[in-house]
Amino acid sequence: MSRSLSKGPYIAAHLLKKLNNVDIQKPDVVIKTWSRSSTILPNMVGATIAVYNGKQHVPVYISDQMVGHKLGEFSPTRTFRSHIKSDKKAKR
């Protein structure tokens, strides 16, 4: 279920304050955040935001196709360990 249009998109207040205080167009500026539930807004395009995935901050470069999605969608929390190809015990 999506958020009501009358409420507007959710973005954490501390993240919005960081975005307003920093020049986001500079490539060396990385904004760290723990707010995975914040929605990507059009004024964030071109910024690099390091989103916490539970272990480390994953840098995410915001492009115009990402507008409307959540920051957590681009920072995976789980790593896939591939299945063992030659497991002789499993063949029995």
Curated annotation (Swiss-Prot):
Its main location: plastid. The keyword Ribonucleoprotein applies. It is found in: Plastid, Chloroplast. Disulfide bonds: none annotated. It comes from the Eukaryota. GO terms for biological process: ribosomal small subunit assembly; translation. GO terms for molecular function: rRNA binding; structural constituent of ribosome. Keywords: Chloroplast, Plastid, Ribonucleoprotein, Ribosomal protein, RNA-binding, rRNA-binding. Pfam families: Ribosomal_S19. GO terms for cellular component: chloroplast; mitochondrial small ribosomal subunit. Protein S19 forms a complex with S13 that binds strongly to the 16S ribosomal RNA. Belongs to the universal ribosomal protein uS19 family. This is Small ribosomal subunit protein uS19c.
